[in-house]
Amino acid sequence: MPKLSQIVADMKQAIDAKDEAQIAFIASEYSADARQRIAQGYRDQYGKELPDDIKKALKGGSEESLLMDLFSDRHEVRAQHIRDALSGKNDHMAFFDTVILCTPEDWHETVAAYTRMFKKPLVEDFMKDVGRKENWCLFMEKWMAHERTSREGSPDEEAEKLNKAFSESDHDYISSFMAGVPPEEYKSINTSFKSLTGKGIDQAFATIYTGTDYYSLYCAHFALLGMHKLAAYLVNCACNDKGDEKRMRRITGMMVDKCLAAKYAYKTYGSMKADVERCFDKRMAPILCTLWRLRE
């Protein structure tokens, strides 16, 4: 990493020039933690908040919001997105982008940030808002606990038990399994499940679930295989939904540095670069291509 003072000076120059492409390039070079150090260095050097100066320099829109998010406390950004998705609106897509696309470490910090910002415990506030009548709500509560323990049986035995749960529509078992299985054990269980049933766990969801119940578990499947795989799926959803800039802001702003391999996982759906350029306008697309390092 170059000297912090030089990076801060480069950022100030880009802001003064209203050069959002250069701001995006600088952001793309560093992790979320490093970007926070840059924001602190900017504060120390100029006595101003970096996101505020980005806001003053640029011309609004999701592009401005995304670049501001990249130099803000990501845990506070996630907490705010969750709060915005609640408030009686229950934006299910936002829950996939913020609750499931999140590492356990980041979730712990987000919970603390939410309480600090809104004076309420996050999980309790979430469940109060969405209720407990639907399967996806109960699954989300288990997922947000981030309590995973090694499975007792072999992959083949666990696959047998899971298949039995599907045949009996045992929603509690299925949701507890998905919320509690360690990621490092999930892949082998999924492989055994395929050998046993002829389909993957993700395909089995479609046999008994629809709507948000289905998509919550489907997203969890990808998250357990690797956050970059979930990011690829969510980016594809955002592209297919008429270029959903709000979703791309959430996915990119909070997780791009942890999910850069998404562009490789995306090959299942096609070319991430081609889809981004096709689905987003001439202002947003180059920023997204820079941040995701889509150069092929």
UniProtKB/Swiss-Prot annotation:
One of its GO terms (cellular component) is plasma membrane. Pfam families: Annexin, ANXE1_4th. Its main location: cytoplasm. One of its GO terms (biological process) is cytoskeleton organization. Annexin repeats lie at residues 2-71, 73-143, 153-223, 226-293. It is found in: Cytoplasm, Cytoskeleton. It comes from the Eukaryota. The keyword DNA repair does not apply. Keywords: Annexin, Cytoplasm, Cytoskeleton, Microtubule, Repeat. One of its GO terms (molecular function) is calcium-dependent phospholipid binding. Giardins are involved in parasite attachment to the intestinal mucosa and in the cytoskeletal disassembly and reassembly that marks the transition from infectious trophozoite to transmissible cyst. They may interact with other cytoskeletal proteins such as microtubules in the microribbons or crossbridges, to maintain the integrity of the ventral disk. PANTHER family: ANNEXIN, ANNEXIN B11. Belongs to the annexin family. Giardin subunit alpha subfamily. This is Giardin subunit alpha-2. It comes from Giardia intestinalis (Giardia lamblia).
